[in-house]
């Protein structure tokens, strides 16, 4: 592109823009606009365990509380999350990816190399969530998650800082943690929302397909649903509190019977 000295001088002063420069700036602005709505977060989870006596080899069968953590200092997990949340538009799209690293990532059973508690290394990486988020302009807005997402039942979660206690209950130990499938959520009103979904299995293995053995069917899927009720602002100390009711029903592993979880 040929540019005379007069145009070049005006461009230097910022009074005009060169065609190529304007196009490049437009592309950069589009890129920064896309990145401005993307968030990166995470945490490092460490612990100190000390049990009196010599019973460290027979600890209660709670998740992430094995004998290898007793009487010492531990790195539990490192989490890295990248998310572009849905905006307020009627049609919206986003995504979320959460990766886990460290010993607790092995116990989550979604390691990238396929290793689990038997044969997995203590520095493994695992996928906690990885889904595409979509919104359709139906009523108040119907939101979808397609991919790997957290289960809809249970009071406790993997992220230790979000639990009321450091140790998790036996209920968390037997509950599903993650599913690979499609989940839809609809906000009925300010005080109530419902969710319904379908997944490959009861979880947690990513992309695993269920097989019920002798039952005659092309494929078997896991079904789930939940209802969330939020207390209104005039309920005093209970204002903003939420009660969840949910059920997950489906096959867990190959040739296994159905598993039903409610909360």
Could you describe each region identified by the protein language model?
Residues 1-9:
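Bacterial N-terminal signal peptides that target proteins for export
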Residues 9-17:
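Bacterial N-terminal signal peptides
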Residues 18-24:
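Sec/Tat signal peptide C-region and signal peptidase I cleavage site
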Residues 209-216:
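Active-site cleft segment of glycoside hydrolase catalytic domains centered on the general acid/base Glu
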